[in-house]
Amino acid sequence: MGTLVLSEVLANADKYDEYLDVYVADDRDPVPESEVELVDYEGPHTPKPPGKRCLLGIDDIRIVLDTWSKWRGGRTPSDAERCEAVAFYAKYDSYLPVE
C-alpha cells in the first residue's frame, strides 16, 4: 500500500474498509502530514504497530467527518479541519463544537 498520510486517509475515508483502524505515532499529535498505518481489526490478530497508537477506526472517522460537515451547513472540511475534528474526537470522545 505504500506510505499513507493522514490527510489522504481522511479525505478518502469512504474508499477504505470500515474494519480498518488508523494508527499514528505515539509521541506526537496527529497533523495532516502524519504518516499512518492501517490495521484490519476484523482479520487475523495483528499486533499494534510499534511506536504507534490507534487514532480511530475508519467507521468512526466517517461519522466524525459527516457530523462535522452537517454541523457546519454541509461545508466540506479542509485537510487541517478534518484532522482537527478526528483528533478532537479521539481525545475527548466528543465532536468538535462549532465556533
Regions found by a protein language model. Give the residues of each.
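Extended, charge-biased low-complexity segments
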Residues: 1-47
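Amphipathic protein-protein interaction modules
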Residues: 34-94, 98
